[in-house]
């Protein structure tokens, strides 16, 4: 089953600027946005990217439903420029990236994204990189504290790093639940928010180089767009949104972009009731003004 896309109407309104055209879905995921766009705009085609193996499998299973209008590439969206070149595509009419972890990824206990996972992996692409388990069990106090603060904006980053090093003296921290226990020994719950939320976010972002990948995509996007083409980014926390906002502002000041969203666009209350995952979603969009 394909996931429920976040703010599909708003996304399509900002992404599709003219009839027809070729678009890039940088984060295919469960195919929700792609299917919505293909159904709403019968004359567009999409090049879809995702580095998650599960996403690749879902596309293959239901490829016929896309009627030959989607080309799927299993790769990190930081490589969009190179991948499009390999397909002899020099320009596209829009670029969409939904920078979030899906409910399916959170629900898969073998992935390590949730607090109850039986593993501390957290890699989006298991072919590459290192697991969060390696970070937690081998990084220094200073490095752990910096990661938790930089990527999770965790105010108790140093206390948590100290608690992790103390726990490591008793043995390896193998599971997400074990790590959560360590964090909860330092930090108390704040309302409904799990005390481990920011540390888990920080580890996931660090392991997958999420902010660096986003920066590369944003840097390459103007060169890949036709005049009038649009970049639409859906982010879920302030770190990502800040990078997008600053990039759009710089390109706007240089005359490369016209910003379409003067303020971030958020989900309506009605959508949040149906899809709680949309609560923290924020859309920013910009249109290329120069060739």
From Swiss-Prot:
InterPro entries named in the record: RsmH, SAM-dep_MeTrfase_MraW_recog, SAM-dependent_MTases_sf
Compartments where found: Cytoplasm
Example of a GO biological process term: rRNA base methylation
Entry GO terms, CC: cytoplasm
SUPFAM superfamilies linked: Putative methyltransferase TM0872, insert domain (SSF81799), S-adenosyl-L-methionine-dependent methyltransferases (SSF53335)
One GO MF term attached to the UniProt entry: rRNA (cytosine-N4-)-methyltransferase activity
Protein's UniProt keywords contain Transferase: yes
Transmembrane segments: none
Catalytic activity: cytidine(1402) in 16S rRNA + S-adenosyl-L-methionine = N(4)-methylcytidine(1402) in 16S rRNA + S-adenosyl-L-homocysteine + H(+)
Alphabetical UniProt keywords: Cytoplasm, Methyltransferase, rRNA processing, S-adenosyl-L-methionine, Transferase
Entry binding sites for S-adenosyl-L-methionine: 31-33, 50, 77, 98, 105
Record flagged with keyword Transferase: yes
Enzymatic class: transferase
E.C. designation(s): 2.1.1.199
Protein function: Specifically methylates the N4 position of cytidine in position 1402 (C1402) of 16S rRNA.
PANTHER family associated with the record: 12S RRNA N4-METHYLCYTIDINE METHYLTRANSFERASE, S-ADENOSYL-METHYLTRANSFERASE MRAW
Family (UniProt): Belongs to the methyltransferase superfamily. RsmH family.
Protein name per its UniProtKB record: Ribosomal RNA small subunit methyltransferase H
Gene from which the chain derives: rsmH
């Amino acid at each position: 089953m394909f996931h429920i896309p976040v703010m599909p109407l708003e996304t399509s309104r900002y992404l599709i600027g003219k009839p027809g055209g070729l678009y890039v879905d940088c984060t295919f995921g469960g195919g929700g946005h792609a299917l919505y766009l293909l159904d709403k705009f019968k004359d567009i085609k999409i090049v879809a990217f995702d580095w998650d193996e599960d996403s690749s499998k879902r596309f293959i299973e239901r490829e016929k439903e896309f009627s030959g209008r989607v080309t799927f590439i299993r790769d990190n969206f930081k490589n969009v420029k190179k991948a499009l070149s390999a397909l002899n595509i020099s320009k596209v009419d829009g670029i969409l990236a939904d920078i979030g972890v899906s409910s399916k990824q959170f629900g898969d206990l073998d992935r390590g994204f949730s607090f109850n996972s039986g593993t501390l992996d957290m890699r989006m692409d298991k072919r590459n990189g290192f697991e969060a388990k390696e970070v937690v069990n081998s990084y220094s106090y200073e490095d752990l504290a910096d990661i938790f603060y930089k990527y999770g904006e965790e105010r108790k980053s140093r206390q948590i790093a100290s608690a992790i090093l103390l726990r490591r003296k008793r043995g390896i921290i193998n599971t997400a639940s074990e790590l959560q226990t360590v964090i909860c020994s330092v930090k108390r719950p704040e309302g409904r928010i799990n005390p481990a939320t920011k540390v888990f976010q920080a580890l996931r972002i660090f392991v997958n180089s999420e902010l660096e990948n986003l920066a590369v995509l944003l840097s390459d996007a103007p060169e890949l767009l036709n005049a009038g083409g649009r970049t639409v980014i859906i982010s879920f926390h302030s770190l990502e949104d800040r990078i997008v906002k600053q990039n759009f502002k710089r390109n706007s000041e240089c005359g490369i972009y016209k910003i379409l969203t003067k303020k971030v666009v958020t989900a309506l209350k009605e959508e949040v009731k149906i899809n709680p995952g949309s609560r923290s979603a924020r859309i920013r969009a910009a249109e290329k003004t120069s060739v």
